[in-house]
Structures are given as C-alpha cells and as structure tokens.
C-alpha cells in the first residue's frame, strides 16, 4: 500500500528541504549526555553507574530523576561522559539491554524542548503483535535509516497496547518506511505505518472551507456545482473555471461557510461518478503547494520503484571484522536462504573496508537475515545489517548527512608531525597540566601524533600544579619510551636548559 503525498507529507518534504537550517544548532557542540528511559522504579543511581561502568569508566556523572515531592523515581535518568565517542558507543552497545528486568531505552539527550516536542522524524505504528518489544520494533525499521528511538506503548501492567512510535534521524526515512512497511504482514497481523501527527496538528489541518472539484463534464455550470454539493452545507460560492474563449476547463471550486461541510463533501463525493465521469474532490491548494506535492510524489514513487525493482533482496553489512572475507561472510548468512552474490569491499592493497553486500534470491530470505543478524557479534564487533540503498536514495541520504553531520569524537591534541631523534626528547617528565597524558592512554598511540619536541634553552612557563598521581610515561611512535629517574624537588618550570 502506497502512502499518497498529502498535507502532512508535504509538511515533511518542506522540513526535509530546509533541514540544514533547522538542525544547525544540534551540531555546534559534541553530545556527551545520554538519556536513559523506561527504567524500573527500583533503579538507583548506583545501579545505573554499575551497569555502564561494565562497558566504560569514562563516566563523569549519573542522575536518576525523581519526583520532587515523593522522592520516587520518574523512570528515566541521565549518564554524562567525558568523551562523546564513549557516549555514542555505550548507546550502541547497551541500548535495549535489561536493567532489573526492564530493557533500557537509550538516546542522546536533547536539551532544547522545542526539538523534543516537534515530532520531527516520528512514525506511528499500530496493529502490532503483543510479543513485539522495543528492540524488535527497532530492528524492523532500522533498515530505512538511523533510528533515534523506538517505543512500544504499554499499559500499567506492562502489556503491549498494540501500537508504538519510531523516531528517525532523517525525514526521508519516514515516508520511505511508511511506503515500504505499511500493510506488511508481521506475525500474522497487517501493521499500519504512517507519519506521526499530533492531535493539535490534525485538527488544525482540517480547518478549510474551499474544495477543489476536477473531471467535470464540459457542460457543467456553477448552478450544477451548487446543486451537487448543496446537501453538505451552506455554500458561499461555486464556480466552474473557463478559458479565454469561455469554454469549461472541466474543474471548479466550491466554498462552504463551515469547515465541517467541506470535509464531509470531500469524504462523500471524492470518487463518485457523475455523468459517466469520476470526480476528484479534494482540498483546494495554491499552485505552489500543488507543485510541491507533485515533486514529492515523483521523488517518493521513484524511491519505491527502485526498492521494488530490487525487491529488498540486497543487504548492506558494515562494521565487519578485518578477518571476514567473502567466504566467511557467505557462511554467516547462508543459513537464511540461497545467496546469489556475496562481496566484502577491500582497498587497493587488499585490506577490508569493513563493509560488504549479501544478495538473496527472495526478499523474505533477506528480511529474515536482516532481523536475525543485525547487531550480532562477529569476532569482537557487532555487525549492522540493513537494506542496500539504490543510487538516488543513497545520494539523498548522503546529502542529509552532509547537512547534518553527527557529533564528532572528542579531539585530542595533535602534536608536530616531525619525528625528533631520541637525544632531543625532553628529559622532563610531564606533570598534570603540562603535556600530561591520562592513564587510559598509556601504551597507546593516537593517529598522527608523536612525543613533544624539546627546544633547547626554551621552556614555556607553567604554574606549578601539585598532583598525587605518579608521572605517566612518555608515549612514542613505537610504544612507551624509557624514562629517566626524576629526583624529588628538582622540577622547576622556570628552569632554563
């Protein structure tokens, strides 16, 4: 079932085209805070810290939000990280993991309430089987783009209400998912998928009085329009449009006094056959709005046509371990059906790029493999499996990503590219605050980095900061360098060499 572009889809299209200006503020700063939702009422801050510290020790603070009056948990909290890269990885690993029997729903914290309440990128899914949880709902829709959050609505006893919500990063993913998944049979139930529209927006969009009527007979007059639509309410004007010679253009407009009458007229008269002509009745729009709808419909049908051509048989696999080759990749997916082609992409020197493609003989086999293999640990990495995108869809996706770059990892200081001989290396052990390197980085090497170079007879004055930590070893291009013994009380930041 195809979702026809309407007023709600048109609104999404306009937001998609100006997304670069809407979301600019989101990317000014790195995101270090994760929102943890759907927490059990008994979860405390210590429980949350213990759960996340199993994955990383890069945690700066933990907070479980409680009611100000009763002190009871509100069912959500926050975890702050020192590095945004650690926050992103923790979200990917721990999202939907259980804490005290309930799966956590994790996403980046959004401090701007206008963005939280905008409903941008949201999809409404109903007629879900009661056995489908948040994780399974996310797996169903992750093939259409980056998913920020998934939630299945439940009653007080924890039983599914049969509907849920999926929030995408890109609005393009919204109507692609709606057209591909709407009417799909999932666990013996046909699900209904559509863009989420708040009750306020829905009511506001229905407030109109002017109706457009197309495919009239050439002999139709203004009086015929009034007679045809008069039963639905009082009409203020009705006109059949004519060309310069006075001939009917076979369409016209009917303006009602009340909006309810206009809505009823569309519902009752659209598709009705009058004088052997099937009428098309809808809300009257400006020419610019109609042009946007036609463009949106064309772009949407092109994407759906390409997806139907491929029939969802080609899968895109990323985050592959370097040890995975064509044979290994085929072995991983062979249990789900007949594989027609399998390829791991490599660089010119033969090293794996960490991505590949697997094409099945049927879309059912590909869907089964995607649901089962997405997030599965292969080697030491979880692989991510989605439907391979057509060229045009991939181009639009890249354009969206370019306009909305994700938060970049925390940048470490980059030192000079020049490699100094060992005799020129500083013989002073860096203290905290002066070229100090955290213990988590000891024995490792940052890309494009080398030890700081000591310039003879020159030292940048730095205030002395006493520390309780022992000095960390210098890290060279090939690991830790041998450290000279440093006698106590000989360190002087103002000393000249």
UniProtKB/Swiss-Prot annotation:
CDD domains: RRM3_I_PABPs (cd12380), RRM4_I_PABPs (cd12381). GO terms for cellular component: cytosol; nucleus; ribonucleoprotein complex. It comes from the Eukaryota. One of its GO terms (biological process) is regulation of translation. The keyword Oxidoreductase does not apply. It is found in: Cytoplasm; Nucleus. It comes from Arabidopsis thaliana. Expressed predominantly in roots but also at lower levels in immature flowers. Belongs to the polyadenylate-binding protein type-1 family. InterPro entries: Euk_RNA-bind_prot (IPR050502), Nucleotide-bd_a/b_plait_sf (IPR012677), PABP_1234 (IPR006515), RBD_domain_sf (IPR035979), RRM_dom (IPR000504), RRM_dom_euk (IPR003954). SUPFAM superfamilies: RNA-binding domain, RBD. Keywords: Cytoplasm, Nucleus, Repeat, RNA-binding, Translation regulation. This is Polyadenylate-binding protein 1. It holds the Pfam family RRM_1. GO terms for molecular function: mRNA 3'-UTR binding; poly(A) binding; poly(U) RNA binding. Residues 32-111, 121-198, 209-286, 313-390 form the RRM domain. Gene3D superfamilies: 3.30.70.330. Binds the poly(A) tail of mRNA. Appears to be an important mediator of the multiple roles of the poly(A) tail in mRNA biogenesis, stability and translation. The keyword Cytoplasm applies. NCBIfam families: PABP-1234. A.thaliana contains 8 PABP genes.
């Amino acid at each position: 079932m195809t979702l026809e572009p309407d007023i709600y889809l048109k609104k999404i299209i306009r937001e998609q085209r100006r997304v670069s200006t809407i979301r600019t503020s989101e990317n000014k700063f790195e995101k270090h805070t994760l929102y943890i939702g759907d927490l059990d009422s008994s979860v405390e801050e210590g429980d949350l810290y213990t759960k996340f510290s199993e994955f990383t020790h890069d945690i700066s603070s933990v907070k479980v939000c409680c009611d100000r009056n009763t002190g009871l948990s509100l069912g959500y909290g926050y975890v702050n990280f020192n590095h945004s890269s650690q926050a992103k990885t923790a979200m990917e690993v721990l999202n939907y993991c259980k804490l005290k029997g309930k799966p956590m729903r994790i996403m980046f914290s959004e401090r701007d309430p206008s963005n939280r309440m905008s409903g941008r990128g949201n999809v409404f899914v109903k007629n879900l089987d009661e056995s489908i949880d948040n994780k399974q709902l996310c797996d169903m829709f992750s093939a259409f783009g980056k998913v920020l959050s998934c939630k299945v609505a439940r009653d007080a006893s924890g039983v599914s209400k049969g509907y849920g919500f999926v929030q995408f990063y890109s609005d393009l993913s919204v109507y692609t998912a709606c057209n591909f998944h709407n009417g799909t049979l999932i666990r013996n139930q046909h699900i209904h998928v559509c863009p989420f529209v708040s009750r306020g927006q829905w009511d506001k969009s229905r407030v109109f009085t002017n109706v457009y009527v197309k495919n009239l007979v050439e002999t139709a007059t203004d009086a015929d329009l009034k007679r045809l639509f008069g039963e639905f309410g009082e009409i203020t004007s009705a006109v059949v449009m004519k060309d310069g010679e006075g001939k009917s253009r076979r369409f016209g407009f009917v303006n009602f006094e009340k909006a309810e009458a206009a809505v009823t007229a569309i519902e009752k008269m659209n598709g009705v056959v009058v004088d052997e002509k099937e009428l098309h009745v809808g809300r009257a729009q400006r020419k610019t709005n109609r042009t946007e709808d036609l463009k949106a419909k064309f772009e949407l049908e092109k994407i759906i046509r390409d997806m139907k051509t491929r029939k969802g048989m080609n899968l895109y696999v990323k985050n592959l371990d370097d040890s995975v080759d064509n044979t290994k990749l085929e072995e991983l997916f062979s249990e789900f059906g007949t594989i027609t082609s399998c390829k791991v992409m490599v660089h010119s020197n033969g090293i794996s790029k960490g991505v590949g493609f697997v094409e099945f003989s049927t879309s059912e086999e590909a869907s089964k493999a995607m649901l089962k293999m997405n997030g599965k640990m292969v080697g030491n990495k979880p692989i991510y499996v989605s439907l391979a995108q057509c060229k045009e869809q991939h181009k639009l996706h890249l354009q969206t990503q370019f306009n909305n770059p994700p938060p970049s990892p925390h940048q470490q200081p980059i030192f000079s590219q020049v490699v100094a001989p060992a005799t020129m290396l500083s013989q002073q052990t860096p203290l905290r605050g002066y070229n100090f390197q955290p213990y988590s980085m000891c024995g490792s090497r940052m890309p494009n980095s080398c030890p700081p170079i000591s310039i003879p007879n020159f030292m940048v004055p730095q205030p002395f900061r006493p520390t309780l930590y022992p000095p960390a070893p210098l890290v060279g291009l090939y690991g830790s360098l041998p450290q000279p013994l440093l006698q106590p009380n000989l360190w002087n930041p103002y000393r000249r060499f």
